[in-house]
């Protein structure tokens, strides 16, 4: 069984296979590959890496993606396990790590889009857009194509993770989705508080 392909047609069977036959190391490998794939577009249109060569941009992008995604991976597994148990679930952290990895499998297939964008736009892809209302250096068609694909894959990944959380905790996918939303709410509130504290500290110092 190839989880990278089967996830598209039989997501629940793929998740069950990962739980029964794979280790956390395998899940970590998936997360690393996914981070490298998504890292290509992480700094697109930001202007943060202007002046760097393409190899340096790739190295920084991949490094940043790994530094963010790997800790977030393990933290998400812990939080989904904890929140799920509060909602009546019976899952464990190991199985949660594997279904989260299963949920990001579709995102790996964004790699060809990232490579194509680099081939077409080169270093300009990572420059800040010029113009008051400019949002991207990509053509409108390519930008819309990329946005639609990313939106669709993100929704599909959320559906898979909802099913996976439900599978691990022995409850419905809807409750699994609720687990995701509760965690997202916690992250949002904590981020908002951190922003308020940071801004308040800066204003106080001024």
What residue spans do the PLM features occupy?
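N-terminal juxtamembrane cytosolic/stromal segments of multi-pass membrane proteins
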Residues: 1-51
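Hydrophobic alpha-helical segments of integral membrane proteins
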Residues: 1-18, 66, 79, 83, ...
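Membrane-interface alpha-helices at helix entry/exit sites of multi-pass transporters
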Residues: 25-26, 93-99, 174-178
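Alpha-helical transmembrane segments of multipass membrane proteins
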Residues: 34-42, 68, 72, 76, ...
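Membrane-helix interface segments in multi-pass membrane proteins
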Residues: 38-68, 114-151, 188-206
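Alpha-helical transmembrane segments with an aromatic anchor "belt"
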Residues: 54-121
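Transmembrane alpha-helical segments in integral membrane proteins
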Residues: 74-85, 152-169
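Interfacial loop-to-transmembrane junctions
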Residues: 163-186
């Amino acid at each position: 069984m190839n989880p990278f392909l089967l996830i598209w047609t039989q997501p629940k069977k793929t998740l069950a296979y990962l739980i029964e036959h794979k280790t956390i190391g395998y899940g970590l490998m998936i997360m690393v590959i996914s981070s490298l794939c998504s890292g290509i577009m992480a700094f697109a249109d930001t202007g943060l890496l202007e002046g760097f060569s393409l190899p340096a941009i790739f190295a920084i992008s991949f490094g940043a993606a790994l530094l963010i995604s790997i800790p977030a991976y393990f933290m998400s597994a812990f939080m989904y396990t904890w929140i799920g148990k509060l909602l009546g679930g019976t899952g464990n952290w190991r199985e949660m790590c594997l279904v989260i990895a299963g949920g990001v499998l579709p995102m790996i297939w964004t790699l060809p889009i990232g490579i194509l964008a680099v081939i077409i736009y080169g270093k300009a892809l990572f420059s800040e857009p010029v113009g008051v209302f400019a949002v991207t250096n990509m053509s409108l068609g390519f930008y819309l194509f990329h946005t639609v694909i990313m939106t669709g894959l993100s929704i599909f990944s959320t559906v898979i993770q909802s099913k996976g959380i439900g599978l691990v905790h022995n409850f419905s996918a809807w409750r699994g989705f609720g687990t995701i939303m509760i965690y997202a709410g916690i992250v949002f509130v904590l981020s908002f508080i951190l922003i308020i504290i940071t801004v308040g500290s800066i204003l106080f110092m001024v």
